[in-house]
Amino acid sequence: MNGMPYHSTGITRHVTSGYLRFHPMLTISLFVVALLSAMLPVVALNSLDLYVQAAKEGAAGQSGGYTYQISGGSNDVAEELRQQVQNGKAIGVKSTRGSVGITSASGSSRNTIADITFLTGPSRYGTLIEGHQPSQKNEISLSRAAAEQIDAQLGDMVTVQCEDSALSSDYKLIGITVDAANTNTVYATAVSSKDNLQNIQMWLTDDDATVNQGKVAKESATNNVNIGYIKSTIRNAEETVRARDLPGCQWYGIVLFLCLLCVHIAVMTAFFRAGQCSGDAVVEALVACGFPLTTSRWTVFRGLLICTIPGAAIGIAAGYAVFGLSYRTIGSIFAQYWEWQPSATSLLSIFFVAAILLCSLCLTWLVLFFRISFKHDITTRNALWYIIPSSAVLMFSCVAIERYHAAAWPFGGSVGSVMGACALGPLLLSLPWLFRTPAQCSAIERTRSLSAPVCALALLLLGASSLFSGQMMIATGNSDNGLFIADYLTQDDLNYLAGKYPETLDKAIVLTAPDESRYLVRAATSHAYDCVIQHGSDDADCYSDSDNETTVMLVDSNSSLAGKTNDVHIAEGGNAGIILIDPATQKITQAAQVPTEGTDSLLNDYTMPGVVLGIDSPQAKTLGLAPSNRHTLVITDFPSIASGVRDSIRSDIINRCGYAFITEHDTTSYRSYMARAIAMPALATIISGLTFAALAISTRQSQSALRWTLQEFGVSRFQLMRLFRPLGITMSLGSTIAVFLGWLGSHPWIVAPANKFGTTGWWWLIPLPVIFIETALFCWWFSLPERRNQ
């Protein structure tokens, strides 16, 4: 046999195939695991991609589908745009609520209430699924939900009734569309005569010259005309979906990757070490026959490749096949309309699966064949080199955390919790209980140089994840939660929203920007205002500090905010300094002190104006302030509104008012922080669990000879398990203390009153149950007698 060439492939092939036949259940299990772990990412990642794409397509369709949305402006702007409508370069739009229905041959009618959009030209609203978009006078398209409610078919005459009698008429149904982001939306889009649309609310155009020239461009410079861009609308919709519906999806992607990686490694390891004819036994037999060690290992290891690579390839193909057959059904679960075809983005899941397979094979090779030799002087004095510095670091961390809670060291909580968690590993592995028996002393001294730094890193990760999770949960409790602000709305936009959401708009606050075509209106702090009085109204240096500047808004004189300021822009006498700035020269042209009605905490938010004056107040008249067509909608209790209504309001503003700017303090930040608060402990659990598992396996391998010697002397299983006690205590007790230190470092219960913050939640405790279960399993495994391959 020794004369046989080492690269003799015939024998090694028979050995590999024989090993697979000898372990049929494990071979099938490995193949199935590879197949399923490839199918799952393909379906999940493609579903996520189509979810976002549907939101973007829905935003584009509901915004009108044209490059620009134009709203607001003076009568001169309206006249200019009407001329563009007549020239075919722009389309007038009017949206309202009304009834759509059909009358059957028997005389019975079926009606439903819908959002109706009237256009002067071709429609691009919605995603067309049947027929074609209306483009001629008296043509209409219905959403699929509206058509189903009235049982309408293409070619039917649809009766439209609304508050505008000129638009109430019969229209021919020529198209069925759908809001790709929400298929339950009930709406209709009709083309009417160009002469019928009075009080046009908005104009749509693809013509760059329309928005960049003439009166539209002139008034847009002073915010009197709002211009929305379809690209911005799509981008805002995508950001909203990623922040609200899919917060932390990248973190959960990493968690999925690590979970599948763990499953692969576990099944591959079991495949190699299972049964009496294990991979180790086959490797030893091949080495005894004269094959090199690497060739012997590869002979068995490639059996893993034979199972996993075909399984993953079939899983990828099956995943795309399943997704191709079911993506419409999956989309309907989320009330979305999905269209899918293979693209470069959809193929990213292949790289995801390939990365899992490659990493699992590499790590499995290390787990199976990597060996570390330990050569240390077995003496208890070596423990002092770990106990003394780690104890000092732990004491310092406790002091740092105490100083943090005493409001002395702002970063003491973070630094102390991380350093303390890091010091726990070497300290617990070196405490005196390890030296009660010579066997324990010998076992731990041989592995401490590896286990101490590894445990330190694992516990550091657990402590940091607990700290991070607590901080993220506290961040969700900020005092500005619940505020919803939509800026740059026009009066027509407000009328539309008030008609659709009357209860919400009745409780909301509507701020109106002053007309700034002649001068900019700003409020100044007392220091900035005094500087203007002393050095002259044209001294811009007095007003150069941006912290001293805030906007001034107008509000209905009966509003509770009329005459109010924030805490910064009110002088000692209760007045507020108002400064008027020439927009052309940026010079201060006028300054005046106006009396106020006190302060309001709502105006302290950075997104709110610093001073609010009543529209008809003497202060506004003295300054010559006139209202513009730019409005800001403020909803102070947005989370208390039903979830469906919140989503509808948000979508209407994003899609129908592409020029609007939304600031939302509740759901986006809350969900994003919540996702991170969950994902970080989950990631730390997986990584630290794998680290402890690898360390435990390595520790048992290093104790193999010692354990065999102890067995020959007749030790019990409990005594064998005691060899794992130092590492087990470090894993369980160390993890508990580490996450508790992280929680202490994140909890500001002494630094500031608790009512100013949220709670730390309980997600930081995620690692502990997993680590406890893992410790118990390794205790059982270490209690098993050592087995030698025959």
Where are these regions (language model features)?
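Alpha-helical transmembrane segments, especially those used as permease/efflux helices
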Residues: 1-33, 40-43, 245-264, 302-313, ...
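Interfacial "coupling" helices/loops that link adjacent transmembrane helices in transporter permeases
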Residues: 23, 265-306, 377-378, 691-729
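The feature marks short, hydrophobic/small-residue-biased sequence motifs that occur predominantly
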Residues: 44-45, 87-136, 175-176, 509-617
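Transmembrane alpha-helical interface segments in multi-pass membrane proteins
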Residues: 285-326, 712-750, 755, 774
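Conserved positions within well-ordered secondary-structure segments
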Residues: 630, 635-639, 656-660, 723, ...
